[in-house]
A protein has these predicted regions:
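Predominantly flavin-linked oxidoreductase catalytic cores and closely associated redox partners
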Residues: 2-84, 139
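A short coil-to-beta-strand element that immediately follows conserved catalytic motifs
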Residues: 90-97, 155-156
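Active-site-proximal substrate-binding core of FAD-dependent oxidoreductases
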Residues: 141-176
């Protein structure tokens, strides 16, 4: 079974524990859009006093958000920060959503015949690209083992858990 039940962790929750990444102090994010024709072919991340802002340009708008620690900044203050940030560029930011989160990962990604993937497995930061990358690496690791060994057992669960723990720790270090 592949548990893709998000933060609920419906299958894997009783089989292993979730470890919070204590070094990742950011625990909240807000995001929205800016109407603007941008030609940057990449996502930009910019450090701020209380976190960081991302800008992902698409045709006709920029998806943008602010990741921060709510110990130091309220949601209202974060929204005001975003409005001021974009106003300084002559643009208007429209808030869409806000979320609180806990960065961390499961102690074991695979236990017996249950494999966790997606938000069920880990959460490092709210940029979708990080989560998509983790999902793809997990699927690739699983498929390589199944194609090689033609079975799934304790050995394969241990290998995937070890590979993903290393990958997730390296990804978390990169984000720091």
């Amino acid at each position: 079974y592949i548990d893709c039940s998000g933060f609920k962790r419906l299958l894997i929750n009783k089989l292993t524990s979730f470890n919070k990444y204590e070094r990742l102090i950011n625990n909240a994010a807000i995001w929205g859009t800016v109407k603007h024709q941008s030609y940057k072919p990449c996502t930009v991340a910019a450090a701020q006093d209380y976190g960081w802002i991302w800008e992902t340009p698409t045709w006709g708008r920029i998806g943008t958000g602010f990741v921060y620690c709510d110990d130091f900044l309220s949601v209202d203050d974060a929204e005001n920060h975003m409005k001021k940030h974009w106003r300084s560029k002559g643009l208007e930011w429209k808030a869409d959503k806000s979320v609180k989160f806990t960065g961390g990962s499961l102690d074991r990604v695979a236990v017996k015949n249950v494999i966790a993937n997606g938000l069920c497995q880990s959460f490092i930061e709210p940029l979708e690209s990080t989560s998509i990358m983790v999902i793809c690496v997990t699927i690739k690791s699983i498929s390589k083992l199944i194609n090689k060994n033609k079975v799934w057992g304790k050995k394969e669960s241990n290998i995937v858990s070890k590979v993903m723990k290393k990958f997730l720790n390296e990804t978390m270090e990169f984000v720091l």
